[in-house]
Swiss-Prot record:
Record EC number: 7.1.1.-
UniProt lineage: Bacteria, Thermotogati, Deinococcota, Deinococci, Thermales
Protein name: NADH-quinone oxidoreductase subunit 15
GO biological process terms on file: iron-sulfur cluster assembly
Membrane topology summary: Peripheral membrane protein
Short name of any one Pfam family annotated for the protein: NADH_Oxid_Nqo15
Subcellular location: Cell membrane
Family: Belongs to the complex I Nqo15 family.
Gene Ontology CC terms: plasma membrane
Enzyme class (EC, first level): translocase
Main location: membrane
Species assigned in the record: Thermus thermophilus (strain ATCC 27634 / DSM 579 / HB8)
Domain comment (free text): Has a similar fold to the mitochondrial iron chaperone frataxin.
Reaction(s) catalysed by this chain's protein: a quinone + NADH + 5 H(+)(in) = a quinol + NAD(+) + 4 H(+)(out)
């Protein structure tokens, strides 16, 4: 992955995190940071240049039960992607960055509207569990 493609993937990740925060605020659920990037945790005195420290985040119900988990590959991974897991719906999607298209799952663009619909499905699956 080229440096510019890598940068664009992490910028798309920041955008996805903003969608998660917006969804949480609109629906009255929790946005939670689950994990930071290892190179942020162990950076010591080195500069940190990724646009966020968050590597894994979740949307959870009022009791803290996650219904959607999202993560991005760490910088050292060779094949970088964003993963979306819907634990109760048994769905696991991978999104990749494609120039000119943004985030795509397979060949389908991952838009904010599509993400909100996916989160709604995941939330409904948790309600019936």
């Amino acid at each position: 992955m080229s440096a510019s493609s890598e940068r664009e993937l992490y910028e798309a990740w920041v955008e996805l995190l903003s969608w998660m925060r917006e969804y949480a605020q609109a629906k009255g659920v929790r946005f939670e940071k689950e994990a930071d990037f290892p190179d942020f945790i162990y950076r010591m005195e080195r500069p940190y240049d990724l646009p966020t420290t968050i590597m894994t985040a979740s949307l959870s119900d009022g009791l803290g039960e996650p219904f959607l988990l999202a993560d991005v590959s760490p910088r050292h991974a060779k094949l970088k992607r964003i993963g979306l897991r819907l634990p109760r719906a048994h769905i696991h999607l991978h999104a990749h960055y494609e120039p000119g298209k943004g985030l795509v799952t397979g060949k389908i663009p991952l838009t904010k509207e599509r993400f909100f619909a996916l989160a709604d499905r995941a939330r409904e699956a948790l309600a019936f569990a």
